[in-house]
């Protein structure tokens, strides 16, 4: 799933979520 901003990653992560170059990254799940 392509993301445009950090809000697009909210459903994918539990704790820290951010969008970088179209990809959602999670930390501390």
UniProtKB/Swiss-Prot annotation:
Subcellular location: Secreted
Record keywords: Disulfide bond, Secreted, Toxin
Protein's recorded name: Orphan peptide CllNtx
GO molecular function: toxin activity
Gene Ontology CC annotation, any one: extracellular region
Function comment: May act as a toxin.
Tissue specificity comment: Expressed by the venom gland.
Primary location recorded for the protein, binned into one broad class: secreted
Note in the entry: This toxin is only found in male specimens.
Organism of this sequence: Centruroides limpidus
Posttranslational modification: Contains 3 disulfide bonds.
């Amino acid at each position: 799933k392509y993301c445009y901003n950090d809000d697009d990653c909210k459903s994918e992560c539990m704790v820290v979520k951010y969008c970088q170059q179209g990809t959602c990254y999670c930390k501390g799940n």
